[in-house]
Swiss-Prot record, chains A, B, C, D:
Protein known as: Glutaminase
Keywords noted in UniProt: Hydrolase
Superkingdom assignment: Bacteria
Gene: glsA
InterPro entries for this protein: Beta-lactam/transpept-like (IPR012338), Glutaminase (IPR015868)
Top EC category: hydrolase
Gene Ontology molecular function terms on file: glutaminase activity
Organism taxonomic ancestry: Bacteria, Pseudomonadati, Bacteroidota, Cytophagia, Cytophagales
Length: 304, 304, 304, 304
């Protein structure tokens, strides 16, 4: 297939959707983004690439970073992790404390905020300098040493992060956070602030399309089984409270962030990254979701 | 691949798991089943079949019938249906009323009981004799005119169905059941009582592996898009409250029933049906889930 | 004190509040009431009476009937009753099913609908003709043999009672309803339909102001201890989801109904009954609550 | 009545109950208490006093301090307070976050922990040195300048207070905490650590039995209306999740603490304070509740 032609087609189709939705505005650094931005990038495991629009522009990857820390965590300790966090869809908002109370401080899955805190806490316990470790891992998989944290965003998150603090202390009260809550959240807010482009992202997650092996470096990042499992978790839990709707429309393991990015995996074939800051009510990029739906319609590349 | 050889291998591997778990005992007709039963059947879209064990023996398909009525419903009216039932995982027990109250009588998806009631209600409204229509559809897709309801099971369900009645009247109070609650549940209890074998099931659902077209008769049952969507719903909502765990271990769109049956779709390739009455705590066949996990390990046929 | 003068004063004060609020309209028989109706009646245990406005006019007592059946139930069996229903405020709407699910079919108290169903079920089990028994008890305490059910209201309730049916079947599924759900609810809908006047009500509940003894007939209805307890339950659970606000403003054990009636007990002294059909958001008579607040302000007769 | 004789009688009756229940052990300072301690004290508004047992011994008043700060808050600002905290029983545990989420950060009442945080936050905003102000108020109403904070207890609370921190940050995320969460909780943990005796307590709260006026000093602490209202809140919300059961058994406006203290008001007459460290499952002093029940049985002094 001529992926570049398909992306070009999508760029035309997507125009009416640009600027729709609501840009995340809970911190000033995100609120200032131009809502009409749109970029899309593909990397296949065979080395084919295609890009359109603002695919080279860095943005705040936010919750997409949860795949990075989850990958690190399963490679560090893939047994204990599942005693501290579940693998089921939550059926409720990404930042709800209700389920956490009903289920005694065990978050439903690693992609809701509380679950991501636990994963970051686990990573935290394994490194002297966890922020450095996460950054090194990110640069390694994306083969881009210029990637870094956006300290302005991280600081903003920290200042407005009362609900994340509430979750952290709540889990701590159940004994499910090992380190100091503020220290874990400091790392968490930094990972969310990672500034990456669509091109970075579609390259970085190729190991999830290639049975755990990064085709660019032939390095094994995780086992095939764990790669399959992360894909399964992305499909069932990766898109906030609209995983079902997204699976229904797009049907690819995916993870979104409130910065407007979405990463989708076509197992055995490729990674697609898309970015557009306007969000739907469920917190996923509105034009990004539409672009992925078009991509699947044009290529038939759904897992179903 | 030599599917028969793989099934034979699985039959050996599975022996330690037979008789484990708990047979559904809320009605006498199900409680009396021999817990060591085990059958498995494959139908590929190319006409290859393989079976082992009790694959020809009929059992109560229970919630697997929800795929049959959902298929009928989307072919009858695939727009209004999604105003009355969601497409998201529930994050709670299949028969919980909590979410129904919080979300004003709109069930989370068509595979929890409340959602299935709405689907049956929708089917009910389109036919003079809905029980006859569902039976005719089932016989047609499975190409087996001897399939019928088990009236003893249906009667037992009705006598113990207080929680289903509670759900039905609760949704009726929100205006989300059109017909008489008792009439809709009478049809629902009958569809659950359908007695089918693994062979029947792996043949019947071939249209979900073949873009909506039944390869046995070349008849189009639903559109490709709707076929993809039912697969997506099965993956995200088909295995009660362990969809995430099942996707993590097996990774195929599947639907289970408390009779011990599970149907799994390998899109573009085949349908696998398995039956063993012992249930895990989440209500899915314990040996059946293990058999599917082994099948995926031996064949690599996961969607991830 | 000159209670008649105080009631006259209140009748003047209350004029701006008449017609405010929303008349219960879920059944036609209630929706047709003139919203400006207002009546108030006092009976002291010493035989003093005072009335104003529409105090002689019969209206649908609705949930006030829950005191009648609770009184019957505690006199029939005051030990087992508290295994089947709690004594705590619910913290949620009178017809919520959420708590019922979280607490395994045991309603929080006898004054939410589910709790009242259990009480009616208990009464039902003790009589050949429970409807006749409840009516006889009501006539006895109010010394008015002309009181009867309003069969039009009862029939309307039955036709729109889907949520009550949902609760009944839900508790039945937990084993907490002994008789047939429809039979119990038939009695429940009849007790709610009882047509009584303010005068009837302030006379009927004098036993709750007089340590369990009806001063009019010197008949012991219940023990002093049980009388105290029903007053305590009325104070903590009698006013739907605004018991705290009502205790804060009025401070008397009270029970309201969606027909617009409220009964308040001044222990050791008197019973006050008030009626005005316009309801506040919490489902209590708006002018009735105001009238009681004025009464307490003028007389200082609060229990606090 | 001869109150001393009645207390002496109770001291005999209560022996079998001493040492029953479970001493609060979440902090070492509380866990070390002798579970057989028992004291009881009465102060009437006419100046009569009576004491038994360990009535002079200081203990940690814990949640009883919520009456002190609520009294300060209503005298400082009795309008805005009710926009930030409700007046309804919670129907759930004293430290639940579920309701807080469902009701957008507005706690149900001032006596659950979250509600007490809001009250302390409000007091905090009015004073340069809020800890000093609370201590001064406490000494003033109890006429005992030797009362002070137990800094060991306060420090222990702070170290184990993750759940309180979770609540604080959660409400902060809804905008319902004005000051820094840690600062407010520091004050809160100190007020909970106040060491007072039964005698101190029965003297301190006389204003609630005397229409807002402290009879010892003839000082008006709050208006009669606010005094009635605090009594109403104590009755409907003061005993954790067993207010209904307590009202049923004792029937007096009361507030308990996990230190084993309970304060009960007989409006117009007296205050009773009781202390015994063994707690029932609901967190109230077991022998203390029994002693109050006996007192009401012997004296008939219930509000119902």
């Amino acid at each position: 297939m001529n992926y570049q032609a398909i992306l070009n087609q999508i760029q035309g189709d997507i125009q009416p959707y640009l600027g729709q939705g609501k840009v995340a505005d809970y911190i000033p650094a995100l609120a200032g983004i131009n809502p009409s931005k749109f970029g899309m990038s593909i990397h296949t495991i065979d080395g084919i690439t295609a890009t359109i629009g603002d695919a080279q522009e860095q943005f705040s990857i936010q919750s997409i970073s949860k795949i990075l820390t989850l990958t690190m965590a399963v490679s560090l300790d893939d047994t204990n992790i599942w005693k501290r966090v579940g693998r089921e869809p939550s059926g409720s908002k990404f930042n709800s404390l209700i389920q956490l109370e009903l289920e005694q401080g065990i978050p439903r899955n690693p992609f809701i905020n509380a679950g991501a805190h636990v994963i970051t806490d686990l990573v935290y316990s394994h490194f002297d300098d966890p922020k450095e470790a996460i950054l090194a891992f990110t640069r390694m998989v994306s083969m881009n040493d210029s990637i870094s944290y956006d300290y302005v965003v991280a600081q903003s998150e920290r200042e407005t992060g009362n609900r994340n603090l509430a979750m952290g202390y709540f889990m701590k009260s159940f004994g499910n956070i090992e380190n100091k809550v503020r220290d874990v959240l400091d790392v968490y807010f930094h990972q969310c602030s990672l500034a990456m482009s669509c091109t970075d992202l579609s390259k970085a997650f190729l190991y999830l399309a290639n049975e755990g092996v990064l085709p660019t470096s032939e390095k094994t990042i995780i086992t095939k089984k764990n790669s399959d499992r992360i894909n399964a978790l992305m499909l069932t839990c990766g898109m906030y409270d609209s995983v079902g709707d997204f699976a229904y429309r797009v049907g690819l393991p995916s993870k979104s962030g409130v910065g407007g990015g979405i990463v989708s995996i076509v197992p055995g074939e490729m990674v697609i990254a898309v970015w557009s800051p306007g969000l739907s009510e469920s917190g996923n990029s509105l034009a990004g979701t539409k672009a992925l739906e078009l991509f699947v319609n044009y290529t038939g590349k759904t897992i179903f």
